[in-house]
Swiss-Prot record:
Lineage, top ranks: Eukaryota, Metazoa, Ecdysozoa, Arthropoda, Chelicerata
Keyword Secreted belongs to the record: yes
Stored SUPFAM superfamilies: Scorpion toxin-like
Comment block on domains: The presence of a 'disulfide through disulfide knot' structurally defines this protein as a knottin.
Native species: Centruroides sculpturatus (Arizona bark scorpion)
GO cellular component terms given for this protein: extracellular region
Full protein name: Potassium channel toxin gamma-KTx 1.4
UniProt keyword Iron-sulfur present: no
Amino acid sequence: DRDSCVDKSRCAKYGYYQECQDCCKKAGHNGGTCMFFKCKCA
């Protein structure tokens, strides 16, 4: 679900968030972005 990506996908310091996006897409969301080093699904 949406919140599981926050724990599973670490967000890198310099904006690399492919892992976050992939996690969110697998969870059924459009994608994800990083805010304050946490993955947020969109």
